[in-house]
Amino acid sequence: MINAQDIKNGTCIRMDGKLYFCIEFLHVKPGKGNTFMRTKLKDVVSGYVLERRFNIGEKLEDVRVERRPYQFLYKEGEDYIFMNQETFDQHPIAHDLINGVDFLLEGAVLDVVSDASTETVLYADMPIKVQMKVTYTEPGMKGDTATNTLKPATVESGATVRVPLFISEGETIEIDTRDGSYVGRVKA
């Protein structure tokens, strides 16, 4: 248990049977009345962000979480099999717990966040940017660079990304895994 005044960014708490990460906090001391903490909490499972006020003396249940590197090995049914890079144990992780799963390649290393007391996986984070080779895209026409037009391109993971017209097959591009958007071309 922690006091509400001890909440900081990244603190994980259990409230109403759900786990929340603090993503923003503010210690408020009004001229009149009691001091309180104004927080923004992100639901670990759904990603829903809510604002919540806590009185300074209020007790909260904190949850200790661990972030460890895991390597993706293969897909088995709906589960993805990962290997803990420290203990070499293999663990299945459900599809919906992996952020940016469309850009997952064999051998990729992800940060897996789990509850330290129960060892249950909360979620797995892809790196924010990944580099992938374009496996298929329509050829661009010469002189089609006047406008900021995008075309679909398939990358090596099988995902489709909208890219500028000058990108051709075989080129390596950088992709933002949060929204699947094109970031730039990677120089060889």
Swiss-Prot record:
Name of the protein this chain belongs to: Elongation factor P
Please name the source species. Answer: Bacteroides thetaiotaomicron (strain ATCC 29148 / DSM 2079 / JCM 5827 / CCUG 10774 / NCTC 10582 / VPI-5482 / E50)
Q: Keywords on this record?
A: Cytoplasm, Elongation factor, Protein biosynthesis
Task: Select a single GO molecular function from the record's annotations and give it.
Answer: translation elongation factor activity
Name the protein family: Belongs to the elongation factor P family.
Protein's job = Involved in peptide bond synthesis. Stimulates efficient translation and peptide-bond synthesis on native or reconstituted 70S ribosomes in vitro. Probably functions indirectly by altering the affinity of the ribosome for aminoacyl-tRNA, thus increasing their reactivity as acceptors for peptidyl transferase.
Task: Kindly give the InterPro entries that the UniProt entry links to this protein.
Answer: Elong-fact-P_C (IPR015365), NA-bd_OB-fold (IPR012340), Rib_uL2_dom2 (IPR014722), Transl_elong_fac_P/YeiP (IPR020599), Transl_elong_KOW-like (IPR013185), Transl_elong_P/YeiP_cen (IPR001059), Transl_elong_P/YeiP_CS (IPR013852), Transl_elongation_fac_P (IPR011768)
GO biological process terms, semicolon-separated = peptide biosynthetic process
Q: Which SMART domains match?
A: EFP (SM01185), Elong-fact-P_C (SM00841)
PANTHER family linked: ELONGATION FACTOR P, ELONGATION FACTOR P (EF-P) FAMILY PROTEIN
- The signal sequence is none
Matching entries from SUPFAM superfamilies are given as: Nucleic acid-binding proteins, Translation proteins SH3-like domain
Q: In which pathway does it act?
A: Protein biosynthesis; polypeptide chain elongation
The principal location of this protein is cytoplasm
List localization entries.
Cytoplasm
Q: Name one GO cellular component term.
A: cytoplasm
